[in-house]
Amino acid sequence: MLMLLVRGTHYESLRSKVVLPTPLGGRGTEALVSECPSPDTGIRWRQSDEALRVNVGGVRRLLSARALARFPGTRLGRLQAAASEEQARRLCDDYDAAAREFYFDRHPGFFLGLLHFYRTGHLHVLDELCVFAFGQEADYWGLGENALAACCRARYLERRLTQPRAWDEDSDTPSSVDPCPDEISDVQRELARYGAARCGRLRRRLWLTMENPGYSLPSKLFSCVSISVVLASIAAMCIHSLPEYQAREAAAAVAAVAAGRSPEGVRDDPVLRRLEYFCIAWFSFEVSSRLLLAPSTRNFFCHPLNLIDIVSVLPFYLTLLAGVALGDQGGTGGKELGHLGKVVQVFRLMRIFRVLKLARHSTGLRSLGATLKHSYREVGILLLYLAVGVSVFSGVAYTAEKEEDVGFNTIPACWWWGTVSMTTVGYGDVVPVTVAGKLAASGCILGGILVVALPITIIFNKFSHFYRRQKALEAAVRNSNHQEFEDLLSSVDGVSEASLETSRETSQEGRSADLETQAPSEPPHPQMY
């Protein structure tokens, strides 16, 4: 009986340690209950006051539960309060159960600033990250703009508002000339179309050879040949306009008429004509090849450089069609269709647009096109300023010079003088002679300098930006390893699930090897925060 009493008393005493509000080591009953879990709730996968061991981009730290509990809405705060391992894995990139370490593949520099946030409650802007990357990191870790310190909030908001207009500023910062991710994604989407096409890999390689001069040695040779043909075509067109060739063609036409033959058949020099046929054949080959190899026919006809290629060969074929309409392959016909001959001459004049084909091989011309595309507002402002200035000063000059016979007879006639003066060209064909007219001309010239200089500065800054950006893109392609570039292209073709699994295993092994390599240089225990 005594033994049972003692056992009953011992049982009651043990029960009282759990139920009664008796403090133990400064902690209440709730702490004691947490150490003795109930069979209904199960054993917790990690203690609530256990420090959190994290690895962010190779930077290992040990975070205290008390610091994380102050910010339960952040990612690390939710990770600390996770009720199960499955819930915790959804908040991190990887978890090492043996080392009880959470891995995050994020920017390590931002993580160091995040540690300062958990200590002080304020987040400071990092100059090494652009505002968009900084905002993405802050959103990932569960921080908002309210977490920014007062000393950095105004600077962050100002940089975020001015970042879309970074190309308006003459800045040499890397963020102003780095390739845009949208451009890279557009190229990848275009190349991905070859995956489902017939002979897609061969077509993709040929397309890149024709479009990217720095892709390979054949692409460089193709670019050199294309430039040579364009220059030869322009040179032939210029030589054809020389007086010596004009006189030679006129004499040949007279001799043909005397012999009873058509003068149109001998109008062109045979050498220049053969050179023209060769250039047209090459241009036609380029256009047809790019059209057949293009990943998207719709996008092909929307690209400005492709439209230039089409316009460069279109006059030749329109001339042939006009010759057929005139009833003769040489372009002659009856008197009733004589006016079509002048249309043929207009078509021949359109050959001058072939010089624009050099834009495909010239960084400066492509940068100029991009500048004009993004400067339509500034160009409109420039034209508006010129129109207002020309109208005002032309009226003043007409009033001052209308009594003199110097060419200022009407206001529309004065517009030519005002335009030439405001653009500071000054042909001198029409000049004022009165004192009032000279004062008006002086004001027109000075006003033109001020009016033209304002928008031109903005346009020049944009051109500098696009030129540096294009150079950076070309340097990235030129300095990149060819095999790495092939691997990048192969990635858009689509890979099997087994290949993806192998890639993930290789990445995991590489990351583990990196951690093992870094382990000896790190302290035995991560720093506690």
Curated annotation (Swiss-Prot):
One MF annotation (Gene Ontology) recorded for this entry: voltage-gated potassium channel activity
Annotated membrane topology: Multi-pass membrane protein
InterPro entries: BTB/POZ_dom, Ion_trans_dom, K_chnl_volt-dep_Kv, K_chnl_volt-dep_Kv5/Kv9, SKP1/BTB/POZ_sf, T1-type_BTB, VG_K_chnl, Volt_channel_dom_sf
Protein location: Cell membrane
UniProt feature, compositional bias: Basic and acidic residues: 502-514
Motif (Selectivity filter): 424-429
Residue span of region Disordered: 494-529
Residue spans, topological domain Extracellular: 240-270, 323-340, 399-411, 432-438
Chain ranges on the Cytoplasmic side, renumbered to this chain: 1-217, 294-304, 362-376, 468-529
Xref: Pfam families: BTB_2, Ion_trans
TM annotation in the entry: 218-239, 271-293, 305-322, 341-361, 377-398, 439-467
GO BP terms in the entry: action potential; potassium ion transmembrane transport; potassium ion transport; protein homooligomerization; regulation of potassium ion transmembrane transport
Gene Ontology CC terms: membrane; perinuclear region of cytoplasm; plasma membrane; voltage-gated potassium channel complex
Family: Belongs to the potassium channel family. S (TC 1.A.1.2) subfamily. Kv9.1/KCNS1 sub-subfamily.
Record's comment describing the protein's domains: The transmembrane segment S4 functions as a voltage-sensor and is characterized by a series of positively charged amino acids at every third position. Channel opening and closing is effected by a conformation change that affects the position and orientation of the voltage-sensor paddle formed by S3 and S4 within the membrane. A transmembrane electric field that is positive inside would push the positively charged S4 segment outwards, thereby opening the pore, while a field that is negative inside would pull the S4 segment inwards and close the pore.
Subunit structure: Heterotetramer with KCNB1. Heterotetramer with KCNB2. Does not form homomultimers.
Protein name as catalogued: Delayed-rectifier potassium channel regulatory subunit KCNS1
Organism: Macaca mulatta (Rhesus macaque)
